[in-house]
Amino acid sequence: MEGQRCIALIAHDEKKDDMADFARHHQKVLASFRIVATGTTGGRVQEACPGLEVIRLKSGPLGGDQQIGAMIATGEVDMLIFFTDPLTAMPHDVDVKALTRLATVYDIPMALNRATAENLIDFNSAD
C-alpha cells in the first residue's frame, strides 16, 4: 500500500518463538504496517498470525539481512525489530552488524530485544 509504513522483523533462531509470540500479541498494530521479514522469521510470524500479510525475503544467513539492509538504505523500511541472541555465535555476524549500522545511519527506530520492541509498538499504536 502506498504511504503505508514498513516494519522489518528478524529473529535469531533462539528468539523466533519470542518473535512469534510478540507478533501474536501485537497483531492488530502490526496489521497497520507493511511487514517484511527474513524467510524463517516471516514463516513463524505467518504461522502465529495467519491474518497478517508478511513479505518473506531470504533467510538471514542466505542474504535476508542484507536485503533488509538495502531496503533501509533506500528508505523502504521505517522501523526494524530484530530479536538478537547475544549468547550464540553467528556465522553471519558481519551481516548483523551491517544491518544495525544501517538502521543507525538512516536513523530509523530499531529494537534489538522484546522490551524495546514493546515500547516501539506501544508508541506506534498511539498514532
Curated annotation (Swiss-Prot):
InterPro entries: Methylgl_synth (IPR004363), Methylglyoxal_synth_AS (IPR018148), MGS-like_dom (IPR011607), MGS-like_dom_sf (IPR036914). The active site is at 65 (proton donor/acceptor). GO terms for molecular function: methylglyoxal synthase activity. Keywords: Lyase. Residues 1-127 form the MGS-like domain. Its EC number is 4.2.3.3. GO terms for cellular component: cytosol. Substrate binds at residues 12, 16, 38-41, 59-60, 92. It catalyses: dihydroxyacetone phosphate = methylglyoxal + phosphate. Gene3D superfamilies: Methylglyoxal synthase-like domain. GO terms for biological process: methylglyoxal biosynthetic process. Pfam families: MGS (PF02142). Belongs to the methylglyoxal synthase family. Catalyzes the formation of methylglyoxal from dihydroxyacetone phosphate. This is Methylglyoxal synthase. It comes from Agrobacterium fabrum (strain C58 / ATCC 33970) (Agrobacterium tumefaciens (strain C58)). The lineage of its organism: Bacteria, Pseudomonadati, Pseudomonadota, Alphaproteobacteria, Hyphomicrobiales.
